[in-house]
């Protein structure tokens, strides 16, 4: 018996000790399959002539990714009992080839359609800092597998913030890559014009390595002493209506970056707030196209909050959609123009600290929209972005900083994160 199998067994034991919480984190947890995959990883690592980048790492899988022999349910009763996938999706195949072990299928907001993580079918877990606070969504279960030390990496997806929001709440690193850099093959969609696969991890280097494997790309080394980072700081949109804790954290981050010699420049991104409804229109319309034939069934077996969000598309005309797609194209161009003189931009990942589950259940529409606000601006603009923790002391929930760039400038984001992260932790 090798080290990878031993590690998998120890993690399985941890899951078994969670009691009822495990059912809120995982939609499926097949111990025998995990051990078979661990045995295969052990053999793959032993036979490889070179070191595998994810050798022996346990990777939880959001229940949107196809795995051979398993039904992908999107954490919905609607999809339970449907035929199992006949093969692994491309991302799963890549992480296995890199030496990783898939470690359970994780719960999410139904169909990945919320930023708060509520799920009436599996229950909603609290976050790692507050058992009564929301976990963030939609990659709620995945975030907790990493935050609780069950897995090294969680595979998530991000349509409006579903990697970055739970990462921010649970003190993790969550990366939303450029959409066209990631394969969506075999990943159950919500809105294909916005969906992006992405990793969550407990440290920056692990998140970067996971991204490299998932995308089939390698972050190039930086030669010599790098120049100061040219950083855009939003004058509007991302920094309006912040709660006091978030405002104080962001001001402190900006001071640290300025003191370290980086060049902070105010940029006007107010057009993102002015066009935020485009996200609501297009995601609802694309989700409606996928699920409208099942609306009758979802009236009895679905989450009514999710169904209501999809049914917003019933109010839209073809002209509304044509206009929204055209405006999004304009917004992407405007974002590129606004970012022309900077390397990256920064903002708080979230405008507020995590509310209580009960508060969100009582005021879902407002709080879900608020939690999605900053992250979804960057889906609207088709950007790439990472959320990294802003430490706040032992036992205190950290804040979170988002670092972003225009589509295709992932390496700029990750290089900036490598330089900014130590400043925040120092």
Predicted regions and their residues:
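Acyltransferase
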Residues: 5, 39, 245-268, 292-297, ...
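Short helix-loop capping/hinge segments that flank enzyme active sites or metal/cofactor-binding pockets
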Residues: 54-74, 228-230, 282-332, 336, ...
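Short glycine-rich anion-binding loops that position phosphate/pyrophosphate groups of nucleotides
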Residues: 64, 350-353
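Structural helix-boundary/capping segments
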Residues: 5-6, 17, 147-239, 251-260, ...
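Gly/Ser-rich catalytic/binding loops embedded in alpha/beta enzyme cores
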Residues: 1-159, 260
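Short, surface-exposed loop/helix-turn segments at secondary-structure junctions
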Residues: 76-78, 278, 322-323, 353-372
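Flexible, acidic loop-helix segments that line cofactor/substrate-binding pockets
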Residues: 25-28, 227-237, 267-280, 303-316
